[in-house]
Amino acid sequence: MTDTPAERPDPGVAGDADWAAQARPLLVHADMRLCKRFDQGEPIERLVALRARAVDQLMRNAWMRCIPADSGLSLHAVGGYGRGELFPRSDVDVLVLGDTAAQQQHEQALARLFALLWDVGLPISHAVRSPAQCTAAAADQTVLTALIESRALVADGQARAALATAIAPPQVWPPRDFFQAKREELLARHQRFGDTADNLEPDIKDGPGGLRDLQTLGWMALRAFGVKDLEALVGLGHVGFDEAAALRREREELARLRFGLHIVANRPEERLRFDYQKTLAERLGFADDPESLGVEKMMQRFYRSAALIRRISDRLLQRFEEQFDGEATPEPLGGGFSLRRGYLAADAESWPDGDVLQVFALFAQWAAHREVRGLHSLTARALAEVLRDLPAYDIADATARERFMALLRGPRAVETLNRMARLGVLGQWIPAFASVSGRMQFDLFHVYTVDQHTLMVLRNIALFAAGRADERFSIAHEVWPRLRKPELLLLAGLFHDIAKGRGGDHSELGAVDARAFCLAHRLSEGDTELVTWLVEQHLRMSVTAQKQDISDPEVIHRFATLVGTRERLDYLYLLTCADIAGTSPKLWNAWKDRLLADLYFAARRALREGLEHPPPREERLREARESARTLMQAQGHDDVTIDRQFAGMPDENFLRFRPEQLAWQAASLIEVEIGQTLVKARRAVPDNDALEVFVYSPDRDGLFAAIVATLDRKGYGIHRARVLDAPHDAIFDVFEVLPQETYADGDPQRLAATLRQVLAGDLHKVRPARRAVPRQLRHFRFAPRVEFSESAGGRRTRISLVAPDRPGLLADVAHVLRMQHLRVHDARIATFGERAEDQFQITDEHDRPLSESARQALRDALCACLDPV
């Protein structure tokens, strides 16, 4: 930008617009040249320095245009700009330094300067302060952080010295206090992101393991040791050469991501949002292949970089702390280990002296002492250096395998596995685990990387083992004590997704890996078969519960036959609960808990009674009626009343609901006469948001659609709907719902009152609400798929609908069914991230299955309603 027009003599304020008009395209062209060099692979360190240099020249020329040479003011770059780094859309932070008299005298000139820079297109963030004001402002460590990296743009030696003196440690923030403040800031920032970088849309600047972590280490080093980069600490013995090299390499990786993100977003975006991930991956050269999408490769690279940065920065933070506090007297633990200021440390400086078995001894000591704060930085570094010598399990000797299994059988096995994963040991011991470390799946269903999901599953298993009830898992704490060998469940959890990303069925491929691992670690044939079977079938219970009708005895019989034994059922149930709950914080809810518990109890009963002769339908009806009768009698109802209510309920009702649900429905019917409408709602689980809505009404056109639309408008998501024909031309509708929007208050009485009011009016006036599709869902659109099959022995038609999920989807589907004059008998709603997979059993208005022409008309109507194109 040597040809900037600002170098001409100042023609006065009137010429500022012309100057800005000429300078603006020069800045744009400079950025375009940098973008081209970025695409050619030039190091980011050089690109951000070149951009800062270009802006430097423009800033100086604008300053000379607006500010008199004898003003007594000086101009300084601060923050990232002060470091000499400017990303494409970053703010340009500057400080104008001068005494208060000079500030006041040139106030209009400064306003002109900043306006001119904005007109050019620079996002200026400025402060005007005297040295004393800098000292006062630096009481806020975030201000000090910006100032300690200041760089003079237009300033003489006196101005530079005045600023340095104003923020020197004798004035503000002694090094130790600054270190503590920045460490607390770092920890608080990590907490804002859930203490993990493994989010679907991570923040590459401020998130854990991001660029801000590296900058924080640099600020600490600058304040404490007076060095401008971490590499300078190598000579001082505070940072290892390998650590400095690794941090420099990962900084380049993250900086390239950030530079590219600013380009594709055309704004100062720091989050890798779905809006930009694919475009950025393509720009960075990550191509799709049969096993992985390019965007998945890019994200895996990021997650691995963030994990390594966190690992090394943890060590450096501890070393910086030791510089201020000194080393405490070691507290011997035995076995060659001690506690140093609460950290576990190897006694020998040369640990582990070539003995890789010491790695397992280290984790055994860690597990044995709950008071340990973490791993001592020197021992952590020694561990990192010895990792390359740790053999994978398949080539390790029997003693090493025994040591690993001893850790797995220990009382704190899940904590140990988490630590081993975080420090890279687990991936070294099981190379397949290293392959999925940092691996994301480009969808909204899996909100964690594969390795983090696996660790979440293991943590959930640890909750089952805690021996106390958890309201999220109603029966898991009862099933857990039945496990013969809990470590087998941990192994199944460890291997269940380990084959993700290889192509093919990950359950089958993972089962092969699990078998090989079990055999290598000398598990018995029975234990090996159990772990292998669990990995291969780990999705079966979830799919059965969510996609099939578990009130159907044939479904239960098929599932129980597949499971075969009570032991397998116990293990599979716990693995399924842990897996679903570890997939997404929002995925597990009271309805899924109840659904899996119902399937568990139904399968357990089938196994107990024998699979050869399942109980006939009449016997099941009789048992359900008697169980419900017993509950109603306990509530004070006589047999005459009970029989009268049972007579008004469809037989199928007794096969689909639990006895306590039947008793609630029957007791509710006492309040209503034939031909009247009843709406009841209750909490399905005490102290939980899950609601059960029961509607008894004369059959009316549009009833189902009106109920669904009302529930949707009130912010409730429907998880299951049962629609049964009752005597006297009435219908039984039972909806299982959860608050889905913030405006759904979760009050069952208010919801029931709203539904009563709607059903008392004209149902044809009730229309689905129109709502915008959330930003994240817009990036996962696909054409809906509609399939038909027969159900109920050919008396009904089953629709299987797979479509992009969005607010109000079910209400729109119900409206289409109503406009096609179709009757809904059953609805099963399942959402998997961005995919809605719903099933309906329907008939035409004459209660007949759909003809081929009716099917085609319905398919066309649904696709027209749901197709995103």
UniProtKB/Swiss-Prot annotation:
UniProt keywords, alphabetically: Hydrolase, Magnesium, Multifunctional enzyme, Nucleotidyltransferase, Repeat, Transferase
Annotated segments matching region Uridylyltransferase: 1-332
One GO term of the biological process aspect: regulation of nitrogen utilization
Cofactor needs: Mg(2+)
Region spans: Uridylyl-removing: 333-691
InterPro entries documented for this protein: ACT-like_dom_sf, ACT_dom, HD/PDEase_dom, HD_domain, NT_sf, PII_UdlTrfase/GS_AdlTrfase, Polymerase_NTP_transf_dom, UTase/UR
UniProt cross-references to CDD domains, sorted A to Z: ACT_ACR-UUR-like_2, ACT_UUR-like_1, HDc, NT_GlnE_GlnD_like
Keyword Oxidoreductase (UniProt): no
ACT domain: residues covered: 692-774, 798-869
Domain HD residue range list: 450-572
EC id: 2.7.7.59, 3.1.4.-
Gene3D superfamilies (UniProt xref): 3.30.70.260, cca-adding enzyme, domain 2 (1.10.3090.10)
Disulfide bonds: none
Catalysed reactions, as listed in the record: [protein-PII]-L-tyrosine + UTP = [protein-PII]-uridylyl-L-tyrosine + diphosphate; [protein-PII]-uridylyl-L-tyrosine + H2O = [protein-PII]-L-tyrosine + UMP + H(+)
Gene Ontology molecular function, alphabetical: [protein-PII] uridylyltransferase activity; phosphoric diester hydrolase activity
Pfam families (alphabetical): GlnD_UR_UTase, HD, NTP_transf_2
Activity regulation description: Uridylyltransferase (UTase) activity is inhibited by glutamine, while glutamine activates uridylyl-removing (UR) activity.
Domain notes: Has four distinct domains: an N-terminal nucleotidyltransferase (NT) domain responsible for UTase activity, a central HD domain that encodes UR activity, and two C-terminal ACT domains that seem to have a role in glutamine sensing.
Stated role: Modifies, by uridylylation and deuridylylation, the PII regulatory proteins (GlnB and homologs), in response to the nitrogen status of the cell that GlnD senses through the glutamine level. Under low glutamine levels, catalyzes the conversion of the PII proteins and UTP to PII-UMP and PPi, while under higher glutamine levels, GlnD hydrolyzes PII-UMP to PII and UMP (deuridylylation). Thus, controls uridylylation state and activity of the PII proteins, and plays an important role in the regulation of nitrogen assimilation and metabolism.
Family of this protein: Belongs to the GlnD family.
The protein's name in its UniProt record: Bifunctional uridylyltransferase/uridylyl-removing enzyme
Organism: Xanthomonas euvesicatoria pv. vesicatoria (strain 85-10)
Taxonomic placement: Bacteria, Pseudomonadati, Pseudomonadota, Gammaproteobacteria, Lysobacterales
Gene: glnD
